Regions:
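Glycine-aromatic micro-motifs
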Residues: 4-138
Length: 138
């Protein structure tokens, strides 16, 4: 069985519920959470979302339950371990996985298409867009 067995934190395009469900068929949206002491940014030639440590800052995102096969699909989508590596943190004593870019290149404004997917995800998860707007004016 491929029942959901791990927790995943989405903060970029995977916040988009329809896209996430299409990519990871076993995924279940649990709730919105804030990752503390990190901030959102966009970088690389893909102009994609990334997170980096920053004191007293937060990254709003979504907690999903995913299966092992979902994780494999995400690994492919995130180009793990070339573009993104895995970062683990604890939320209410439970281990959560997320992705963070390997190369911390400079800020690059995302494409309109990508940004629209992220914005839709913020709506889907009912997240505060204040932090997204802040990330776009670096």
């Amino acid at each position: 069985s491929s029942r959901p067995i791990m927790l995943y934190f989405a903060y970029g395009s995977n916040l988009h519920h329809f896209q996430m469900k299409r990519r990871c068929k076993d995924s279940i949206f649990i709730k919105k959470i804030n990752l503390k002491n990190f901030r959102l940014t966009f970088r690389s030639k893909y102009r994609a979302a990334d997170i980096e440590p920053k004191k007293n800052s937060i990254v709003p995102g979504a907690l999903f339950e995913i299966s092992k096969s979902d994780e494999k699909k995400l690994d492919i989508y995130e180009d793990f371990p070339i573009l993104y590596k895995k970062h683990y943190f604890f939320y209410n004593r439970k281990k959560v996985m997320t992705y963070t870019m390997v190369k911390k290149s400079q800020f690059r404004f995302p494409t309109e298409r990508y940004l629209n997917i992220v914005k839709r995800g913020y709506k889907d998860c009912n997240l505060n867009t204040k932090f997204l707007k802040k990330a776009l004016i670096q």
